[in-house]
C-alpha cells in the first residue's frame, strides 16, 4: 500500500503532497517566501521574556 501523504499548506491551506515537494511543508515557493518574510518582519514571535537591548548588562553583571 503506497498512500500519498497530503498536508495543508500552512500559508494558504491548499492541499499539497510531501513526497517530491521541494517547498514542503508549503505548496509553492510563493508561500514559502511569504512565510520567510513574515519571520523577517518579526510578524511571528516566540513567547518568552523580552531579550535585553544591545549594550544592556546581563543579569549578574556588575
Swiss-Prot record:
- Which stretches does the entry tag as region Disordered? 43-62
> Which cofactors does this gene product need?
Zn(2+)
Query: What GO MF terms are annotated?
Result: zinc ion binding
- Which Pfam families does the entry link to? YacG
The protein's UniProt keywords, in alphabetical order, are: Metal-binding, Zinc
Q: Which family does it belong to?
A: Belongs to the DNA gyrase inhibitor YacG family.
Subunit info here reads: Interacts with GyrB.
Protein name in UniProt: DNA gyrase inhibitor YacG
Q: Which organism is it from?
A: Citrifermentans bemidjiense (strain ATCC BAA-1014 / DSM 16622 / JCM 12645 / Bem) (Geobacter bemidjiensis)
Task: Name the gene that codes for it.
Answer: yacG
Amino acid at each position: 500500500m503506497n498512500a500519498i501523504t497530503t498536508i495543508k499548506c500552512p500559508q494558504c491551506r491548499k492541499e499539497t503532497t510531501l513526497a517530491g515537494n521541494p517547498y514542503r511543508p508549503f505548496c509553492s515557493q510563493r508561500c514559502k517566501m511569504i512565510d520567510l518574510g513574515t519571520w523577517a518582519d518579526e510578524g511571528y514571535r516566540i513567547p518568552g521574556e523580552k531579550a535585553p537591548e544591545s549594550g544592556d548588562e546581563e543579569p549578574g553583571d556588575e
